[in-house]
Amino acid sequence: MVLPVCDHYSGVEVRMRKSLQLQAEMTQEFGACVFDVTLDCEDGAPVGGEIEHAHLVKEMTSSAAPEARLAVRVHPVDHPSFFDDVDLILGRVHSRLRHVMIPKVESVADVETATRALDQAGALNLPLHVLIESPAAVHRAFEIAAHPRVQSLSFGLMDFVSAHGGAIPASGMGVQGQFTHPLVLRAKLEIASACHANGKVPSHCVVTEFSDLNAIKVAATKASRE
């Protein structure tokens, strides 16, 4: 399985459009798509404006260039807007998407809930990417990765650190701390091992020092080689 080396999330309209434009420009420059664009409903939709945001994502997906590599991050399966996201977006433009990202997955039961919803919406063959964001989810990573619909596991670093209630300092989210703090490093290893055991793709977490190209290079190198 081959996926682009980066998945770029954006949820604000102007940034979503800019991301799609940048993807097209870099695809032309390098002759291949070097990053996916994931249109974000979870963090992108304003409270109370979830339906309107879902319509916007649907419209942007349907009007994107045919060669664009697009995905959508929907709300978690226990969020009131999850089924609206599935119905309004995946039920109408799933053929234009490469995958759907399901955040805050805690168990195989969450994966099954998402799978049933996608199937009922007609997105029968759309792969699932899941975000592992809690200690309990890390504990169940092998079971989650074994699900046949799951294509990739991603590590939700910030929510994972937050879930520890101060046991992991903020430095654990930095480009150095995320590779040295025992609890964070253990989570990364569990996710990677679960993916390798099941033939899935492990995806590294965010790098907050995005303006530091050397920091990004160091993080990407460590993630791919260690």
Predicted feature residues:
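Expand to "…catalyze enediolate/carbanion chemistry for C-C bond making/breaking, isomerization
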Residues: 1-226
